[in-house]
């Protein structure tokens, strides 16, 4: 049996759902699951220091392979001693494969069996990313958890296109495994694709599980499908994945989607949502989203969320944070970003406790009622 550098330990299953409490052991420490991972696109979580992330309970963060490959370059980061030393973060790091950014950011993509040729979005130069190159870059970055190179087809692509795509992604996964130079200290995850097609998700899962990765990611969701469609895909995909390995739902950060993913047995999540909306003054609170820049809060001297015990809510008022944002002061974005990240990391801590108490469905109902989900804030 292979001794993987990434190990999943199941602690408890929730009595009434597929939720599971566990922990993931990595070369840079152990973190509890289910866990939300803050995204540090450019080797930094926007406006936050590593110490602040540790204080809020983030045992793992995500960094983007595509961005770091282009700037400052994976070889420079390797010279610095790897990503952990480069950014002074001593806990776990997960890197994506770069594939999603190639499809979403780069211009003039050309996908072939060999890989993807594209135009660099920074300077317009022609570049090529293959399964082997994606692994090589991540080996240089030195992340604890790496991703296989995959194609992320749009959710509503035609069946025939998605079928060809997942079959190529499986071949790319095999090539990536062969190219992996550091299997002893970096765990490589396979990414299950298949859009909304159950048989294609089954085919993709079967292919990847047969390759015996140390963990599995569910890709191709949170790309425009409805909340109900996402849940349906999870309902038929998660049971196809091994129980003794981590399950990671990529790119998901809306609070109800996190809880619904946990109910279906998912362990890990990431999303830029909390920091992206924070820059526009939108805050997640126990009673739903709050746009603190609105004039209604100009003389509101209460915390952003009276039920939150984060640094922002313990020390500053809505009126002050609004003033900072209106004055274009960076500190305002730091405060809203910290609050939103804390909100999701803390939400996962509450979810873990609900699993311990076997009352996750009750917790979900209470949360959804208070958060006030409706058509206008479904994605927040």
Swiss-Prot record:
Disulfide bonds: none
Annotated Gene3D superfamilies: Queuine tRNA-ribosyltransferase-like
Superkingdom field: Bacteria
UniProt-listed Enzyme Commission number(s): 2.4.2.29
One Pfam family from the record: TGT
A single GO BP: tRNA wobble guanine modification
GO (cellular component) term, any one: cytosol
Subunit structure: Homodimer. Within each dimer, one monomer is responsible for RNA recognition and catalysis, while the other monomer binds to the replacement base PreQ1.
Functional note: Catalyzes the base-exchange of a guanine (G) residue with the queuine precursor 7-aminomethyl-7-deazaguanine (PreQ1) at position 34 (anticodon wobble position) in tRNAs with GU(N) anticodons (tRNA-Asp, -Asn, -His and -Tyr). Catalysis occurs through a double-displacement mechanism. The nucleophile active site attacks the C1' of nucleotide 34 to detach the guanine base from the RNA, forming a covalent enzyme-RNA intermediate. The proton acceptor active site deprotonates the incoming PreQ1, allowing a nucleophilic attack on the C1' of the ribose to form the product.
HAMAP family for the chain: Q_tRNA_Tgt (MF_00168)
The protein's name: Queuine tRNA-ribosyltransferase
Protein's organism: Streptococcus thermophilus (strain ATCC BAA-250 / LMG 18311)
């Amino acid at each position: 049996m292979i001794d993987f550098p990434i190990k999943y330990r199941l602690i408890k299953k929730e009595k009434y759902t597929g939720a599971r409490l566990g922990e993931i052991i990595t070369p840079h420490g152990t973190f509890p699951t289910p866990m939300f991972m803050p995204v540090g696109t450019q080797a930094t979580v926007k406006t936050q220091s590593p110490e602040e992330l540790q204080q809020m309970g983030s045992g793992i963060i995500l960094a983007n392979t595509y961005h770091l490959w282009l700037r400052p370059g994976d070889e420079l980061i390797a010279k610095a001693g790897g990503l952990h030393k480069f950014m002074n973060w001593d806990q776990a790091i997960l890197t994506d494969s770069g594939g999603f950014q190639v499809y979403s950011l780069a211009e003039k993509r050309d996908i072939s069996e060999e890989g993807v040729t594209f135009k660099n979005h920074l300077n317009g130069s022609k570049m090529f990313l293959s399964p082997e190159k994606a692994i090589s870059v991540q080996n240089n970055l030195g992340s604890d958890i790496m991703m296989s190179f995959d194609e992320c087809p749009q959710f509503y692509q035609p069946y025939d296109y998605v079928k060809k795509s997942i079959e190529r992604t499986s071949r790319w996964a095999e090539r990536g495994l062969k190219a992996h130079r550091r299997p002893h200290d970096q765990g490589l995850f396979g990414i299950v694709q298949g859009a909304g097609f159950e048989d294609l998700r089954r085919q993709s899962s079967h292919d990847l599980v047969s390759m015996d990765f140390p963990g599995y990611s569910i890709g191709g969701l949170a790309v425009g499908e409805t909340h109900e469609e996402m849940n349906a895909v999870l309902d038929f995909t998660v049971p196809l994945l091994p129980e003794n390995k981590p399950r990671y739902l990529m790119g998901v950060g809306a609070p109800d989607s996190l809880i619904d993913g946990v109910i279906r047995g998912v362990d890990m999540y990431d999303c830029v949502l909390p920091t992206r909306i924070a820059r526009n003054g939108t805050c997640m609170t126990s009673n739903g989203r709050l746009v603190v820049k609105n004039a209604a809060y100009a003389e509101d001297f209460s915390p952003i969320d009276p039920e939150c015990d984060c640094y922002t809510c313990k020390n500053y008022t809505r009126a002050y944070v609004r003033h900072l944002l209106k004055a274009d002061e960076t500190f305002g974005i730091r405060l809203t970003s910290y609050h939103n990240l804390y909100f999701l990391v803390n939400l996962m801590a509450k979810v873990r406790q609900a699993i311990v108490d076997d009352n996750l469905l009750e917790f979900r109902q209470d949360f959804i009622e208070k958060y006030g989900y409706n058509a206008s804030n479904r994605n927040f």
